[in-house]
Amino acid sequence: MNKHIEQLYRSAKKRSRLIIGLMSGTSLDGLDVALCRIEGHGTDTQIELVAFCTVDYDDGYKQKIKSVFAKRQVDLQQVTLLNPWVGVLHGQMVNQCLEKWNIAATDIDAIASHGQTIYHCPLGQHGQSEFGNATLQIGDADHLAVTTGILTIGDFRQKHIAAGGEGAPLAVYGDYLFFTSKQENRILLNMGGIANLTFLPCSADASAVFSSDIGPGNTIMDAYVQRHFSPLHYDKDSAMASQGKVHLGLLDSLLEHAFFALDFPKTTGPEVFNLDYLSVAQAHSATRQLAHEDVLATLNLFSARTIANAINDAAIELEEFNVYASGGGIHNPLLMEHILRLCPNVTAIQDTSKLGIDPDAKEAVLFAILANECLVGGQQPFGNLEQGIPNITMGKISFPD
């Protein structure tokens, strides 16, 4: 038997496994590295977040990725070069974290790598029925495995599309397995570059679970700050947005996109919601000369309105439910204030630390869960294709030699 197959067998038989989850989102701020000790599988999954850090990306990384990110036409040579380069760089970042934590690579059972999304293109976006849904992540897992010496599981989204999904959101699998409660209805809200939610009924009925993208979280706000307030990367503590005044005409123009009228589930990305989208909305509302602070105030409420509308729609038939939030948006006080005000049935929005997971680490942890299911799961089927949740095992395995 191949030694790596033996290693897979040994890892699967362990009472607990050490799995590193990696997440690099559309915000391009850094690589989230979550070291998880995981016991069990399926709905019996137990997780301890042993260590977590975000390794910041430097400006060179951001510029290279932005040259091919969310663009219909790019330099194909650059994409080809970046695919292994990102894999090696992410591997080096994992090595840095392991050294910082004083943990040997040989102690790790697997790395779960999301990679770096550079283009997400569901059928509803491109409209070419012969091609169906599509998405592309770079950061080759073989290069990551060789760089770290650790078995790596990656490229999770392709199986989701192959089985009838849109490749996103994948959070629903980990949310269902780890965060479902028999005591309360829950909405898991994640606010990264793009916001998404997962609805988890206390019945734990898989047919009632759904997950969907909502629209822009931080993506347009961050891009606007980076363009007009360089070298700042985001509106810290919503300081600039708090100084501005919402322009209702611009807000109405931003809310006109057909995506917001689509039923759940649906997916989107910065390919749609970006500075070009803002520019068109400003042209329609004659607000090209609006003060930067007023634009940021309006963008903040725009994100909040779409998020609140989604929460209200998801829970329309519920008398009681709780919202648990994660992602960079939880650090935006004005955004959180708007969402709470616009959700009359929500008395408080708690972050996922209340459920035992650092809200900044949640997405990386969820990919560790997917890797664990790839290794030892499959005995408890979970899926609902009508809600875009195919019953599948995701991830491709890359050996370190």
Curated annotation (Swiss-Prot):
Pathway given for this chain reads: Amino-sugar metabolism; 1,6-anhydro-N-acetylmuramate degradation; Cell wall biogenesis; peptidoglycan recycling
Which InterPro entries does UniProt cross-reference here? Anhydro_N_Ac-Mur_kinase (IPR005338), ATPase_NBD (IPR043129)
The domain of life for this entry's organism is: Bacteria
Query: CDD domains annotated for this entry?
Result: ASKHA_NBD_ANMK
Keyword Repeat recorded: no
The record lists ATP as bound by 25-32
The enzyme class is transferase
Q: Name one GO molecular function term.
A: ATP binding
Which GO biological process categories is it annotated with? 1,6-anhydro-N-acetyl-beta-muramic acid catabolic process; amino sugar metabolic process; peptidoglycan turnover
Q: What is its EC number?
A: 2.7.1.170
Catalytic activity field = 1,6-anhydro-N-acetyl-beta-muramate + ATP + H2O = N-acetyl-D-muramate 6-phosphate + ADP + H(+)
List the NCBIfam families.
PRK09585.3-4
Protein function: Catalyzes the specific phosphorylation of 1,6-anhydro-N-acetylmuramic acid (anhMurNAc) with the simultaneous cleavage of the 1,6-anhydro ring, generating MurNAc-6-P. Is required for the utilization of anhMurNAc either imported from the medium or derived from its own cell wall murein, and thus plays a role in cell wall recycling.
Q: Which family does it belong to?
A: Belongs to the anhydro-N-acetylmuramic acid kinase family.
Q: Which HAMAP family match?
A: AnhMurNAc_kinase
**Protein name in UniProt:** Anhydro-N-acetylmuramic acid kinase
Natural source organism = Pseudoalteromonas atlantica (strain T6c / ATCC BAA-1087)
